[in-house]
């Protein structure tokens, strides 16, 4: 009995005296859809606008990794057709490129490393850019559609960017 009391006191003391454990945030959010004979997934970090208008702060010619803290990754079990370009199955980085004010492009890169260079571009397709949507505080990337074609829908703040793709 005495041993149980001592064990309980030591256990309670160690818990009360232990530094707080901060849990890591869960996995990055994902957009996913079945396409053709496989699945397509987009995984990204999810920044908040916090009162900022980040999209309007971008300069023409700049690239945006479409997320926070890490690259946005497209994983596909099937080859994809973006515009006239076939992107092989596998993992790739997604970026948005502001070619000029109001003119956006979706860029798919070979690498999933940290640094992007234009030489790694596999495909570039126009993004449809729309303003005036209801405010979305947290960046959201969704894959809408199934069967043979789908659309990547990016919403953040009052903006919406979209690009269509299909199985090859």
Regions found by a protein language model. Give the residues of each.
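Positively charged n-region of N-terminal signal peptides that target proteins for export
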Residues: 1-4
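A near-ubiquitous, low-amplitude feature marking generic local secondary-structure context
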Residues: 7, 57-59, 108
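Bacterial N-terminal signal peptides
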Residues: 7-18
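Primarily secretory-pathway and cell-envelope proteins
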Residues: 22-62, 98, 113-168
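Mid-length scaffold segments of soluble, non-membrane domains
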Residues: 65-112
């Amino acid at each position: 009995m005495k041993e149980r009391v001592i064990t309980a006191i030591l256990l309670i003391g160690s818990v009360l005296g232990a530094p707080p454990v901060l849990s890591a945030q869960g996995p990055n959010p994902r957009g996913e859809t079945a396409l053709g004979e496989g699945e397509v997934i987009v995984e990204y970090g999810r920044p908040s606008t916090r009162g900022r208008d980040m999209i309007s702060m971008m300069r023409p010619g700049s690239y945006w990794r479409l997320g926070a803290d890490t690259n946005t990754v497209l994983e596909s079990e099937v080859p994809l057709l973006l515009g006239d370009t076939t992107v092989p199955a596998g993992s790739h980085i997604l970026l948005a490129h502001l070619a000029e004010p109001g003119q956006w492009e979706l860029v798919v890169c070979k690498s999933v490393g940290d640094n992007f260079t234009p030489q790694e571009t596999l495909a570039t397709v126009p993004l449809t850019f729309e303003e005036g949507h209801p405010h979305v505080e947290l960046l959201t990337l969704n894959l809408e559609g199934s069967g043979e074609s789908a659309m990547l829908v990016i919403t953040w703040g009052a903006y919406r960017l979209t690009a269509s793709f299909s199985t090859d």
